Each structure stands twice: as structure tokens, then as C-alpha cells.
Regions:
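Histidine-bearing beta->alpha loop at or near hydrolase active sites
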Residues: 166-171
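Hydrolases whose catalytic domains are alpha/beta-hydrolase-1, hotdog thioesterase
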Residues: 99-103, 123
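Serine-hydrolase catalytic machinery in alpha/beta-hydrolase-like enzymes
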Residues: 1-87, 99
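Short beta-strand/loop motif that positions the catalytic acidic residue
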Residues: 136-137, 143-145
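Gly/Ala-rich beta-loop-alpha elbow adjacent to hydrolase catalytic centers
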Residues: 92-100
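Conserved alpha/beta-hydrolase "acid-adjacent" motif
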Residues: 146, 150-155
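Post-His helix in hydrolase/transferase enzymes
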Residues: 66, 173-189
Length: 192
């Protein structure tokens, strides 16, 4: 798929490594991703914000999920080599949340942060992506979605925590303090 770009925020002796990526249409500087990054950094974690290869190559859509997942696994493996023995937490926004969930078991992630997990295409609840959310097995997943998200909101029983921010659609306009407050205790739980 080609190279990715990684924006790395390091700390000495990190308690964990958060590897997080964007959605299909956004970037790693989205305010919700930055809220998670800041919380992770404050909790003693190193943070790798990943611009996926399709985006680096100029693509607008992620394309084939298998290729996207294989690329993600290579990225995480390279980061693990740089941070040996450090627990990995992975996350993403929208399409990136799907990738993080689908690959969590193979990565052996300590946990997953899923921002705006797109449960189904807008107006098509019969095309559920619940199986991707459940692909994490016993790995804890924290989902943060807007209450008005046209992509749906996962059921509370399908994740360790599902936080719904009222009056927010798929792209958050407010609630970044809620996002930070939601992820902070989970980072403490997943740290070494």
C-alpha cells in the first residue's frame, strides 16, 4: 500500500503506546483525536498518530479492508520494535476505529479507543458492522459516539464502555472534554 506518516509524541519510559488513526475523510489533527492524544500523553503514554498509506498516496477512500488491515499491522509492528515491551493501545476515528477493532487481537492490544464507530452506513441499519466491533474478543473497547450520529451508535453491551455525547453527529463539534474524561481512566487501567 505504500508508506504511512507517523506523528510521534514521546515520553521517557512510556506507560503505554497509543497508536491512533483518522477516519476516511479526516486527518490526525481532528479535535477528538487530539483530545485522546492529550489524555494519553498526560497519563504517561507515548502517542503515534498515523496517517494511513492510502491518504499519504493521495487517496480519498481507504479501499480494501484487508489491505488496510495488513498495512496497519505492519505499522504497529514497526512501532512495537521502537517501543519494546510497552503495552499497545490502539484507536481510531470512524473508519480508523474499524481498523483498530478488526486488528486488535492480532496486535495483542491492551485496549481500543473507537471514536465515532460507524455501526452501519447512514440509513442502512441492516448493514451492521457490529461484527467488526466484536472482533476484539476479550480486549476492552471504549466507544465514544455522537447521539445524533447517522452511522448509528453501538449497543452498550458490545463494548466495555459506550459514551454517547448528546446532540453530536458523526464529526464532533463539542464534547472534547467528555472524550478526554472518558478515556483517561482507561489509559490508567491499560498502562504497565
Amino acid at each position: 500500500m505504500g508508506p504511512a506518516e507517523i506523528e510521534l509524541d514521546e515520553v521517557g519510559d512510556p506507560a503505554f503506546l497509543l497508536v491512533i488513526t483518522h477516519g476516511a475523510g479526516g486527518g490526525v489533527d481532528a479535535e477528538d483525536i487530539l483530545a485522546v492524544r492529550d489524555s494519553a500523553f498526560a497519563a504517561g503514554g507515548a502517542v503515534a498518530r498515523v496517517v494511513q498509506p492510502y491518504r499519504v498516496a493521495g487517496g480519498r477512500a481507504p479501499g480494501n479492508a484487508d489491505k488496510q488491515d495488513r498495512a496497519w499491522l505492519e505499522i504497529v509492528a514497526a512501532l512495537r520494535a521502537r517501543f519494546p515491551g510497552v503495552p499497545v493501545v490502539q484507536g481510531g476515528r470512524s473508519n480508523g476505529a474499524r481498523v483498530a477493532c478488526r486488528t486488535a487481537v492480532e496486535v495483542a492490544a491492551k485496549g481500543v479507543i473507537a471514536l465515532s464507530f460507524p455501526l452501519h452506513p447512514p440509513g442502512k441499519p441492516e448493514k451492521s458492522r457490529r461484527d467488526e466491533l466484536l472482533a476484539t474478543g476479550d480486549i476492552e473497547v471504549v466507544v465514544i459516539n455522537g447521539g445524533s450520529d447517522p452511522f448509528g451508535v453501538p449497543d452498550a453491551a458490545d463494548a466495555a464502555e459506550v459514551r454517547v455525547i448528546p446532540k453530536q453527529a458523526h464529526s464532533f463539534r463539542t464534547g472534547f472534554d467528555v472524550i478526554a474524561a472518558t478515556v483517561t481512566p482507561w489509559f490508567a487501567r491499560w498502562a504497565r
